[in-house]
Amino acid sequence: MRYWYLRLAVFLGALAVPAWWLYQAWIFALGPDPGKTLVDRLGLGALVLLLLTLAMTPLQKLSGWPGWIAVRRQLGLWCFTYVLLHLSAYYVFILGLDWGQLGIELSKRPYIIVGMLGFVCLFLLAITSNRFAMRKLGSRWKKLHRLVYLILGLGLLHMLWVVRADLEEWTLYAVVGASLMLLRLPSIARRLPRLRTRHGVS
């Protein structure tokens, strides 16, 4: 397997972060409401992983190194895993294992609906992130996986609705996300390899 060391580093890093958070919760180091802190951190971790996933293609075009693409799918699947953990923590710590509370939560916090829409889209990408699905779907596979851009928008909207007045951190993620989208515009994406060539010549 090519770039096994890079894949291993991603695996260990993505696994270590939630494990550390759980340990912090165990020793009561997450403040007065550790459950909510876990929910928030897992959601933010999923957004960071989504941004990292989207950054792999521009990085490959700029550097010419295929290792970035080698871990792109892995990062995307870890993003989905973090979202699953985010939802699980929400069910345990916010709903108290009571689905009956979900209706009340939805009426008070409609941003949950936005988050669920993002989860459904991400689920579709996760179950089709394999060669079998690529062969079966053919040209439709790429069209389906463009949902990642919608997922980013939903994720940022979900976070914006959650943080409300505290916009400083959200703005940082929004700027990074918007920059990654700009790098995918055909007129800009075509120039990225040229930048690498010019840098190599100079």
Curated annotation (Swiss-Prot):
One of its GO terms (biological process) is protein repair. Keywords: Cell inner membrane, Cell membrane, Electron transport, Flavoprotein, FMN, Heme, Iron, Membrane, Metal-binding, Transmembrane, Transmembrane helix, Transport. It holds the Pfam family Ferric_reduct. It is found in: Cell inner membrane. Binds 1 FMN per subunit. Binds 1 heme b (iron(II)-protoporphyrin IX) group per subunit. Its cofactor is FMN; heme b. The keyword Flavoprotein applies. The chain crosses the membrane at residues 8-28, 42-62, 75-95, 110-130, 147-167, 169-189. It comes from the Bacteria. One of its GO terms (molecular function) is metal ion binding. It is a multi-pass membrane protein. GO terms for cellular component: plasma membrane. Its main location: membrane. The keyword Cell cycle does not apply. Heterodimer of a catalytic subunit (MsrP) and a heme-binding subunit (MsrQ). Belongs to the MsrQ family. Part of the MsrPQ system that repairs oxidized periplasmic proteins containing methionine sulfoxide residues (Met-O), using respiratory chain electrons. Thus protects these proteins from oxidative-stress damage caused by reactive species of oxygen and chlorine generated by the host defense mechanisms. MsrPQ is essential for the maintenance of envelope integrity under bleach stress, rescuing a wide series of structurally unrelated periplasmic proteins from methionine oxidation. HAMAP family: MsrQ (MF_01207). This is Protein-methionine-sulfoxide reductase heme-binding subunit MsrQ.
